[in-house]
């Protein structure tokens, strides 16, 4: 089995956040890999990884980083694959990481999700893959139908809650 999604984090300290992406992909049976690579500490390994990802069958890369958050941009500069950046919350509440990821120069785009929004990164990666993979598309559609059903149930439950001045 080849990974369709590659999850890269600057260090294993990002794993508690990125586990949400791993869990979503695993629950939806979308093959993925997880590695720690640092744009600052292992730049050659990052470049080698990024250049070889497409050849290994990877379709989308999710790159998580905090603080200066160079990792997503460095990867995007070295691969033709789409890169999704996940800013990790740190001392500046993730604002530093988010700005580092979204302020890329022309020609080196990085899609960006919210601070610590690893699950959204996994869903976005699956949606990108779903454009050309019907099996993944069906998994995404089924998952979205499931979350819609949860909201419908919540509204039915709320309809049963009684207050004197509640109008619905």
Where are these regions (language model features)?
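Glycine/small-residue-rich loop that forms an oxyanion/phosphate-binding "nest" at active or ligand-binding sites
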Residues: 78-102, 106
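Short alpha-helical segments enriched in small residues
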Residues: 36, 41-46, 54, 81
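Active-site nucleophile and cofactor-binding loops and adjacent substrate-binding regions
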Residues: 38-39, 64-68, 87, 112-117
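Short glycine/serine/threonine-rich phosphate/pyrophosphate-binding segments
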Residues: 14-18, 42-46, 65-74, 92-95, ...
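Glycine-rich phosphate/diphosphate-binding loop of Rossmann-like nucleotide-binding domains
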Residues: 2-41
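C-terminal binding/interaction regions
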Residues: 3, 9-16, 20, 95-168
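Glycine-rich phosphate-binding loop
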Residues: 49-87
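Structural motif
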Residues: 4-7, 32-33, 59-61, 81-84, ...
């Amino acid at each position: 089995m080849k990974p369709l999604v590659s999850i890269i984090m600057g260090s294993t300290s990002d794993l508690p956040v990125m586990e949400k992406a791993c869990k979503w992909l695993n629950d939806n049976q979308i093959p993925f890999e997880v590695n720690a690579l640092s744009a600052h500490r292992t730049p050659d390994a990052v470049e080698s990884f990024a250049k070889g990802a497409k050849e290994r069958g990877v379709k989308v890369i999710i790159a998580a980083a905090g603080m200066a958050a160079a990792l997503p941009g460095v990867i995007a500069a070295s691969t033709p694959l789409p890169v999704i950046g996940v800013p990790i919350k740190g001392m500046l509440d993730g604002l530093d990481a988010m700005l580092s990821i979204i302020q890329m120069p022309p020609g080196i785009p990085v899609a960006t999700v919210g601070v610590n929004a690893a699950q959204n990164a996994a869903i976005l990666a699956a949606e990108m893959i779903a454009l050309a993979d019907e099996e993944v598309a069906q998994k995404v559609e089924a998952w979205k139908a499931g979350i819609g059903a949860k909201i419908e149930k919540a509204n039915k439950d709320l309809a049963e809650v009684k207050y004197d001045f509640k109008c619905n």
